[in-house]
C-alpha cells in the first residue's frame, strides 16, 4: 500500500516542549549488528532508553528510530560520516520523539515517518503510515504493523530478512559476514522478557499486537526501546520459578548487564520461550500477568 503524505508541514516549535529534560549520559560506543548491506546500531540515552540507527557499513545515509534526545545521536552520526535521511517513530511519548526537532534543525531534509492516526501528537510527520503499509528505506522493505495497547496508535516496523538467516533457536553472538535476519522495531509494545504498560489500550489489543510479533520468523531481531530485561525476567522467574529457560536467560542477562553490555537485540524465538506475555493464551491471561507485573516490587 502506498504511503499517504501527511496533511501538515513541519513546525519544530510545536514540539519544543517535548524535548527530554533528563541529562544525557556520556556517549558510549554502541555495538553494531548486521551484515554487509544494512546494519543496526544502538545508542544508549537517558536512563534506560535506546535509540536505533539503521545504516550501511560505511559513511552514507542513515535512519534513526525513536530519538529520545538529539545531541548524542548527532554526535554518533557525524563521527561516522552518516547523513540522516529519515526518522521513524513508533508512538508519541516524549522519550521517543523528544530529539526530533533538533535532529531536523541539523538535517532539515530528513523525512519523519509515523502513524497518521497520531498526527496531532506527532505533528512533524512528512510521511504518514498505517498498519498494512509497506515502503522502502536504504534498500530494505519496511512493513508497518498496527500494534495498539501501550498507546492507541502505536505502530511497529518490521524489516524482512535480506539474506540467509541463522538456525532458528540458535543462541550466542550474532554471526559476522553476509547473514541478516529480519528486524523488528517495536517501541514499547514488546520488551525483552516483557511488554509495555497499557496506558491507552486494552488487554485484547495488546494480546492481538503480540500475536503479530509471535508470527514473525523466530530469527527476527527484536529492538525494543528500553533496557528492562533483567527486571522483566526477575519478575517472570518469580511467577514461573521452575521454568529452566527463564532462569537460564535471567542468569545470562545479569552477567551481561554486570559487564556493561546491552541485552538488546533479543530474538522472536527467544521471546517465545521466555516471555510470559508472548506466551499468554488469551487476553484474560495477559491481563492477569500485566497486573502482576505492575504490582511487582522485586
How should these model regions be labeled?
Residues 1-18, 158, 173-175, 186:
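Intrinsically disordered, low-complexity proline-rich regions
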Residues 4, 8-82, 102, 107, ...:
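Zn-dependent metallo-beta-lactamase
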Residues 19-27, 167, 211-221, 228-298:
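Accessory terminal helices/loops
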Residues 47, 62, 69-146, 160-172, ...:
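Active-site HxH/HxHxD metal-binding segment of metal-dependent hydrolases
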Residues 54, 66, 91, 103, ...:
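Divalent metal-coordination and catalytic microenvironments
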Residues 54-55, 158-160, 236-237:
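Short beta-strand-to-turn element immediately C-terminal to the catalytic PLP-Schiff-base lysine
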Residues 67-69, 92, 117-118, 150-151, ...:
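Active-site metal-binding loops of divalent metal-dependent hydrolases
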Residues 194-220:
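Active-site-adjacent loop/tail segments of enzyme domains
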Amino acid at each position: 500500500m502506498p504511503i499517504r503524505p501527511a496533511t501538515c508541514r513541519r513546525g519544530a516549535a510545536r514540539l519544543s516542549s517535548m524535548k527530554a529534560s533528563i541529562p544525557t549520559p556520556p556517549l558510549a560506543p554502541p555495538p553494531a549488528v548486521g551484515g554487509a548491506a544494512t546494519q543496526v546500531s544502538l545508542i544508549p540515552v537517558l536512563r534506560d532508553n535506546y535509540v536505533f540507527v539503521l545504516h550501511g557499513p560505511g559513511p552514507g545515509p542513515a535512519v534513526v528510530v525513536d530519538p529520545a534526545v538529539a545531541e548524542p545521536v548527532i554526535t554518533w552520526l557525524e563521527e561516522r560520516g552518516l547523513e540522516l535521511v529519515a526518522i521513524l517513530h513508533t508512538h508519541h511519548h516524549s522519550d521517543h520523539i523528544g530529539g526530533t526537532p533538533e535532529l531536523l534543525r541539523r538535517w532539515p531534509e530528513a523525512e519523519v515517518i509515523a502513524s497518521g492516526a497520531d498526527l496531532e501528537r506527532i505533528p512533524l510527520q512528512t510521511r504518514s503510515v498505517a498498519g498494512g503499509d509497506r515502503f522502502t528505506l536504504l534498500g530494505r522493505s519496511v512493513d508497518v504493523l498496527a500494534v495498539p495497547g501501550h498507546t492507541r496508535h502505536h505502530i511497529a516496523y518490521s524489516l524482512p530478512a535480506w539474506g540467509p538467516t541463522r538456525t532458528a533457536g540458535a543462541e550466542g553472538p550474532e554471526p559476522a559476514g553476509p547473514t541478516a535476519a529480519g528486524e523488528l522495531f517495536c517501541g514499547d509494545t514488546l520488551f525483552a522478557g516483557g511488554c509495555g504498560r497499557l496506558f491507552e489500550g486494552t488487554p485484547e489489543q495488546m494480546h492481538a499486537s503480540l500475536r503479530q510479533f509471535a508470527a514473525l520468523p523466530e530469527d527476527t531481531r527484536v529492538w525494543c526501546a528500553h533496557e528492562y530485561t533483567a527486571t522483566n525476567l526477575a519478575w517472570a522467574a518469580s511467577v514461573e520459578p521452575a521454568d529452566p529457560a527463564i532462569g537460564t536467560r535471567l542468569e545470562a542477562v545479569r552477567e551481561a548487564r554486570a559487564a556493561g553490555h546491552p541485552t538488546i537485540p533479543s530474538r522472536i524465538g527467544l521471546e517465545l520461550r521466555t516471555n510470559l506475555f508472548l506466551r499468554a493464551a488469551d487476553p484474560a491471561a495477559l491481563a492477569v500477568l500485566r497486573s502482576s507485573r505492575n504490582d511487582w516490587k522485586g
